[in-house]
Every structure is written in structure tokens, then in C-alpha cells.
A protein has these predicted regions:
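Sigma70-family region 2
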Residues: 15-16, 39-44, 53-70, 89-91
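Amphipathic alpha-helical segment used for protein-protein interaction
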Residues: 5, 12, 16-19, 91, ...
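Internal acidic/polar
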Residues: 1-8, 85, 93-119, 146, ...
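C-terminal edge and immediately downstream basic/flexible tail or linker adjoining helix-turn-helix-like DNA-binding
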Residues: 1-3, 13, 95, 124, ...
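Short, charged helix-capping/linker segments at alpha-helix termini
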Residues: 3, 13-24, 34-53, 158
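DNA-recognition helix of helix-turn-helix
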Residues: 80, 84, 88, 133, ...
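Structural recognition of an alpha-helix C-terminal capping motif at a helix-to-coil junction
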Residues: 35, 49-56, 69-81
Length: 197
């Protein structure tokens, strides 16, 4: 599940301004960056804009990037910093009222209602986490970075990463338990996430 590093030759070409090489990098990492940003900000159009801005910053900073560092770690440092800037700016802006009729419904076909309900509850619980816990959890469980890569990307200690992920998972499980949703061990036959009856 770990995110692979880009080809060093492609990375060097991109550092020298080769747009084709940079587009290869963007294509390789655009989806994981977007998914991470979307889960942090919760709004698709904002996540799309922020993802574009992240890659603009990466393009601008690439000539100064040290090839001795892991690219994915640096990429998610840039991403984290841009998202935190946006979240701080949002806190200072007045909030608009959202009409629930304007929110599109989630449509997933061929999935049992209970499973969709459980998945939705998981994402609600993740969204309720504070940004520090949410960032660490998403980088691990959605993006697939190692604990060490997360520590580097978030510029925190390895012990702090482990605690944040542990605490985030614990908080999500408690939130789900409050909604009556239980998890069965993956080793059990036909293990699924279901609402408790």
C-alpha cells in the first residue's frame, strides 16, 4: 500500500523544467494528493483547487528539492502546509449556510444499505477528528505512507505519529460504537462492517 517514489531520471528532468517529466509526476500522485486533501477539507471543488495549487508549489520548488530526500515525503509536506493555510483562512472567513437540497446524494450501486451506512459513518467519524489526528490517519490509511514518512511529512516525531494514529483510530471506533456500528476481526469468515442490531 506504500506510495512508490518517482523514477529518479524523471525527477531530475522535472527539476530542470521538463514539462513532460513533471506531468508524469503529476499523473502518478494527483489522485493520492486529491484524496488526502478532499478528506481534510471535505469539499470537492476546494480540494480540486488546492490539489492544483499543491502541484504548482511542487513545480516551483522542485529545482530546490534534494534528491537525497524522499519525494513523497516532501510532496505531502507541501500538501499539508497548503491545506493548513487554507483551513486557517477558512476559520477567519464568515461561513455561508448550505442548503441540504443542494448537496448531491451519494450513489453507490450493488452495495447493501447497511454497508453503505457503515462506510458513511466511518467517514463522518474521520471528518470529526481534529486536523492533526485526521492528517496522520489519512496519510497512513488512505495514502499509504509509512510511519516514518508521515513523521517527515508532518514534521513531527515518530512517537507522535504513532500516538496520533492510535488516538484517531480509537476516536473513530468510539464514534462508531456510539452509532451502534461494530467491526468483526478480518480473520473471521465473511468479515464485514455492520450496524449492530
Amino acid at each position: 500500500l506504500s506510495l512508490p517514489q518517482p523514477d529518479p531520471g524523471v525527477l531530475r528532468k522535472a527539476q530542470r523544467g521538463d514539462e513532460r517529466a513533471f506531468s508524469i509526476i503529476v499523473r502518478a500522485y494527483q489522485v493520492p494528493v486529491f484524496n488526502y486533501v478532499l478528506r481534510l477539507v471535505g469539499e470537492r471543488s476546494l480540494a480540486e483547487d488546492l490539489t492544483q495549487e499543491v502541484f504548482l508549489r511542487v513545480y516551483q520548488g522542485l529545482p530546490r528539492f534534494s534528491l537525497r530526500s524522499k519525494f513523497t515525503t516532501w510532496l505531502f509536506q507541501v500538501t499539508k502546509n497548503r491545506v493548513l493555510d487554507e483551513l486557517r483562512a477558512v476559520e477567519r472567513r464568515p461561513r455561508a449556510v448550505v442548503d441540504l437540497d443542494d448537496v448531491p446524494a451519494l450513489e453507490v450501486l450493488d452495495a447493501p444499505f447497511e454497508r453503505l451506512e457503515a462506510i458513511d459513518a466511518v467517514w463522518r467519524a474521520v471528518e470529526a477528528l481534529n486536523v492533526d489526528l485526521k492528517s496522520a490517519l489519512l496519510l497512513r490509511d488512505v495514502v499509504g505512507l509509512s510511519y516514518t514518512e508521515i513523521a517527515d511529512a508532518l514534521e513531527i516525531t515518530l512517537a507522535t505519529v504513532k500516538w496520533r494514529i492510535y488516538k484517531a483510530r480509537e476516536d473513530v471506533q468510539l464514534a462508531l460504537a456510539r452509532e451502534g456500528i461494530t467491526f468483526y476481526a478480518a480473520s473471521e469468515p465473511d468479515a464485514v462492517v455492520t450496524p449492530a442490531v
